Regions:
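C-terminal motif of bacterial Sec signal peptides marking the signal peptidase cleavage site
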Residues: 25-28
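N-terminal accessory alpha/beta regions
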Residues: 61-172, 176-187, 193-195
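Bacterial signal peptide processing site
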Residues: 30-32
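N-terminal secretory signal peptides that target proteins for export/translocation
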Residues: 1-12
Length: 281
């Protein structure tokens, strides 16, 4: 059985992942390798802890010791270029056993769609209701897996800056889990669209997010077509994702971008968004 880790990371997660953390029984993290010479970026132990609290999910003794021995500049440089950061064995075993870690997005969505259609096709009302509830419960379970995996990585991965930035971008490019089957997509959305680009170029990150089925479905671009323009994705792309409110664009700009994006929808048969020429304007 894992024991709860007693450091400030858990306190910082409380308002964000309270439900998920309550479900977990977590083990301590092994100390990181040490070595090197300290520098002047964090001259005192108190300053070092405050600095770590700002750029990690909470300062702890082992990380502070590494920063002291390596030096803040060297440690931060390593954080900005993480090389295959690994979790403690027990945490990694939990992550590896998850459905979202073992099943690709396309197969997972196909499985869930089949379950939904099979439930809807039942003629007996009682059986149909039970099957539909089972479908919703499975979607909830997949969403809990994604949340649990995120928390385990954030608490125990040595790549703390990457974890902070993954969380930041997950909030910036958020999707709503109550919509359609997005709960089945959340794990892949984080792993394939956000996490690989969390420390990279914003343009690459924006592209990965804009082409992911979770975002396209959440903001209705799978319904955006010639003759029935849906401006939702175009507006959010400008207002929330890039330029911001009062960012210098006009309603006409939103309309034109929406036309550019017509036909960019979701094709789970190939696992990638698909531009349908008959819908493009």
């Amino acid at each position: 059985m894992w024991r709860m880790r007693s450091d400030t990371r858990l306190l910082r997660f409380a308002p964000l992942w309270g439900l998920c953390v309550a479900l977990l029984s977590l083990s301590g993290c092994a100390p990181l390798p040490t070595g090197g010479v300290p520098d002047a970026l964090a001259p005192t132990a108190q300053a070092r802890y405050e600095w770590l609290n700002r750029i990690t999910w909470g300062a702890n003794t082992s990380t502070a010791r590494v920063v002291e021995q390596q030096g803040s500049a060297r440690w931060l440089q390593q954080q900005l270029q993480p090389q295959g950061a690994s979790l403690p064995e027990s945490a990694q075993a939990t992550v590896s056993a998850m459905t979202i870690s073992q099943t690709g997005l396309t197969d997972l969505v196909h499985t869930m769609e089949k379950q939904r259609k099979d439930a809807d096709a039942l003629r007996d009302d009682i059986a149909k209701k039970a099957a539909q509830q089972a479908y919703q419960q499975e979607l909830n379970r997949l969403a809990r897996e994604a949340a649990t995996r995120h928390v385990l990585r954030a608490l125990y991965s040595p790549a703390q800056v990457q974890e902070q930035m993954t969380w930041f971008w997950l909030n910036h490019f958020n999707v709503h889990l109550s919509k359609h089957n997005l709960r089945a997509m959340l794990g892949d959305y984080e792993d394939s669209a956000l996490r690989p680009h969390a420390l990279g170029r914003f343009r690459d990150l924006l592209g990965a997010v804009s082409y992911h089925p979770a975002m396209l479905r959440y903001l209705d671009n799978d319904q955006n077509a010639a003759g029935r323009i849906n401006e939702n994705f175009a507006r959010e792309l400008m207002e929330l994702h890039t330029l911001g409110v009062d960012g210098g664009y006009t309603q006409k700009d939103v309309q034109e971008l929406a036309r550019v994006l017509t036909g960019l929808g979701v094709n789970m048969n190939s696992g990638n968004p698909n531009l349908r020429k008959e819908l493009n304007r």
